[in-house]
Curated annotation (Swiss-Prot):
PANTHER family: TRNA DIMETHYLALLYLTRANSFERASE. ATP binds at G17, P18, T19, A20, S21, G22, K23, T24. The keyword Magnesium applies. It comes from Burkholderia vietnamiensis (strain G4 / LMG 22486) (Burkholderia cepacia (strain R1808)). The lineage of its organism: Bacteria, Pseudomonadati, Pseudomonadota, Betaproteobacteria, Burkholderiales. This is tRNA dimethylallyltransferase. Keywords: ATP-binding, Magnesium, Nucleotide-binding, Transferase, tRNA processing. It catalyses: adenosine(37) in tRNA + dimethylallyl diphosphate = N(6)-dimethylallyladenosine(37) in tRNA + diphosphate. It comes from the Bacteria. Pfam families: IPPT (PF01715). Catalyzes the transfer of a dimethylallyl group onto the adenine at position 37 in tRNAs that read codons beginning with uridine, leading to the formation of N6-(dimethylallyl)adenosine (i(6)A). NCBIfam families: miaA.
Length: 324
């Protein structure tokens, strides 16, 4: 084998798509054909005890094919894009060493971007500083901290809502630890990183030719979650003293709305409508991310044979037949 062939990157198929686009069906179809292991690209599936609202793969589905990065942390904890990148690169190597094929599947596009493009050199979390900022917010309110951020990093503040506690806290934390605005750090060239250079990530994107059809699916899916006991799931989480709406886990679509309903802040119908609307907004953002990937292979997720089309696209990628 020539040196050029030896150094050719290993192709990794990535099945990406918005909520309710059929990713699970396509991944399981591939698992019926090849010895794959699925690496979840989903920031909600990492949390334990959050099964219904995140549409986590069922026990039967997980028994049919190994899944990774699911149920790995407690809802009181956080999981970063940096952690995802490190874990995924490690898992890809471990899966290949077992003689299986890794398939990345999910819809958290920020994770995918971190994996394929690397990370900016931002300081890590500082628990003591976060506690200090939380205390300031408890006293003055998050809009006051948003105003503080606007004075030192107006570009970041301009894209954040005054009550976006998690992101305001992180932006202030970065500024205070680094001495630079987060917007400036994000705009700086990424540090050289060879960790992912051994791989060629090829995205197969499940996108709707008619968004209204996907919106109808989203409503049906949310109703199915409610019927499956989603409110009870959130109630169990709500009874925990260490969980609150400011945590990343409780920012997952649907959980905040169900929590507000249980608090008596909104009625059941409003909770349902807000949950569906939030899911549609997530879907819109996911599609925007996908369409910014010129290298993606597009499959119409509302076509009658969408699973077969996705399966064919994935197999072509893995067989080296997809255009480079």
């Amino acid at each position: 084998m020539s040196v050029s062939l030896q150094s050719r990157p290993t192709t990794i198929a990535c099945l990406l798509g918005p909520t309710a686009s059929g990713k699970t069906a396509a991944a399981l179809a591939l698992a019926a054909r090849r010895p794959i292991e699925i690496v979840s690209v989903d920031s909600a599936l990492v949390y334990r005890d959050m099964d219904i609202g995140t549409a986590k793969p069922t026990r039967d589905e997980r028994a049919r094919v190994p899944h990774h990065l699911i149920d790995i942390i407690d809802p009181a904890d956080s999981y970063s894009a940096a952690s995802f990148r490190a874990d995924t690169l490690r898992l890809i190597g471990e899966i290949a060493a077992r003689g299986n094929t890794p398939l990345l599947a999910g819809g958290t596009m920020l994770y995918y971007k971190a994996l394929t493009q690397g990370l900016n050199d931002l300081p890590g979390a500082d628990p003591a500083l976060r506690a200090e900022l939380d205390a300031d917010a408890a006293r003055d309110g998050w809009p006051a901290l948003h105003a503080r951020l606007a004075r030192i990093d107006p570009a970041t503040a301009a894209r954040l809502a005054p009550n976006d506690a998690q992101r305001i806290q992180r932006a202030l934390e970065v500024c205070m630890l680094s001495g630079q605005p987060m917007s400036a750090l994000l705009a700086a060239p990424r540090a050289a990183d060879d960790a992912a250079a051994a791989y060629r990530f090829v995205p197969v994107a499940l996108e709707p030719s008619d968004r209204a059809v996907l919106h109808a699916r989203i409503a049906q899916r949310f109703d199915a979650m409610l019927e499956a006991g989603f409110i009870d799931e959130v109630e169990r989480l709500r009874r925990r003293e260490d969980l609150h709406l400011g945590l990343p886990s409780m920012r997952c679509v649907g959980y905040r709305q169900a929590w507000e309903y249980l608090d008596g802040a909104i009625d059941y119908r409003t909770m349902r409508d807000k949950g569906i609307f939030a899911t549609r907004q997530l879907c819109k953002r996911q599609i925007t991310w996908l369409r910014a990937m010129p290298e993606r292979i597009v499959v119409d997720c509302i076509a009658r044979d969408s699973t077969a089309q996705a399966l064919d696209a994935l197999e072509r990628v893995l067989d080296g037949l997809a255009a480079r």
